[in-house]
């Protein structure tokens, strides 16, 4: 953390998500190949693959709605996949989206193995209102999730981070977190920063601009009038001068 803070924050307080609380997804076997995949997608389902250390790679299909819920759920992507009477505790390891519609095209599920750590991405949940924000600062949340390596029984639903003590000028990084498992995200990754408010200059109104233009024009006109008065003789004086010269040379 940067700034004046000499203290060490302990912001990490994971909310455990037992695998038994994971959503259940009903899957069906599927054929492989591009033609079969297109037919599956046309029926609002997604072709998937399930694999694991002790699980043979298994092609399957699931409802697109079930996958969308898992993708956009604000918790660890853990699920129970059921097919033909078998159940696997899994994580959503990877998925592909259509580049234009964001429709899921394919997904990979990794079966969780007892005693084997698994690497997955878990959402961050920031709690508290920074002191700096209460004093007019702006809180910028840079990171929304972290990649961690953890045993299946210790997978957190979210990574809860307390940012209430941050003042203006403070930043929170991955290396500030105290965890009981390995964080794969770079230690130098900034999570949150609190910056001073931006002072905006009041925009000049059209009326003020017109008034300034008129004032400049008036000043210019007054200057021309002064030059005329000082540099040119009056009409009477010019006539008198001309007459005197004629009389002198007659």
From Swiss-Prot:
GO terms for cellular component: cytosolic large ribosomal subunit. Residues 198-250 are annotated as: Disordered. Gene3D superfamilies: Ribosomal protein L25, beta domain, Ribosomal Protein L25, Chain P. Pfam families: Ribosomal_L25p (PF01386), Ribosomal_TL5_C (PF14693). Keywords: Ribonucleoprotein, Ribosomal protein, RNA-binding, rRNA-binding. This is one of the proteins that binds to the 5S RNA in the ribosome where it forms part of the central protuberance. Part of the 50S ribosomal subunit; part of the 5S rRNA/L5/L18/L25 subcomplex. Contacts the 5S rRNA. Binds to the 5S rRNA independently of L5 and L18. HAMAP family: Ribosomal_bL25_CTC (MF_01334). Belongs to the bacterial ribosomal protein bL25 family. CTC subfamily. This is Large ribosomal subunit protein bL25. The lineage of its organism: Bacteria, Pseudomonadati, Rhodothermota, Rhodothermia, Rhodothermales. The gene is rplY.
């Amino acid at each position: 953390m940067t700034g004046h803070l000499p203290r060490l924050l302990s912001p990490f307080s994971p909310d455990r998500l037992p695998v038994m609380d994971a959503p259940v997804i009903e899957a069906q076997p599927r054929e492989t190949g591009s033609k079969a995949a297109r037919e599956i997608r046309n029926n609002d389902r997604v072709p998937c693959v399930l694999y694991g250390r002790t699980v043979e790679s298994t092609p399957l299909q699931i409802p697109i709605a079930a996958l969308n819920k898992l993708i956009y759920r604000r918790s660890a992507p853990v699920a129970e996949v059921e097919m033909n009477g078998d159940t696997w505790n899994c994580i959503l390891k990877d998925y592909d989206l259509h580049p234009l519609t964001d429709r899921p095209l394919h997904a990979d599920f990794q079966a969780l193995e007892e005693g084997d750590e698994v690497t997955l991405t878990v959402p961050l949940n920031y709690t508290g209102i920074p002191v700096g924000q209460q004093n007019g600062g702006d809180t910028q949340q840079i990171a929304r999730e972290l990649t961690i390596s953890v045993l299946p029984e210790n997978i957190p639903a979210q990574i809860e981070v307390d940012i209430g003590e941050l003042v203006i000028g403070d930043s929170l990084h991955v290396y500030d977190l105290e965890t009981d498992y390995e964080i794969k995200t770079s230690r130098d990754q900034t999570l949150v920063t609190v910056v001073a408010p931006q002072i905006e200059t009041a925009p000049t109104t059209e009326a003020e601009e017109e008034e300034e233009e008129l004032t400049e024009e008036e000043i210019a006109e007054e200057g021309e009038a002064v030059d005329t008065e000082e540099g040119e003789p009056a009409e009477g004086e010019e006539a008198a001068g001309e007459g005197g010269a004629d009389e002198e040379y007659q």
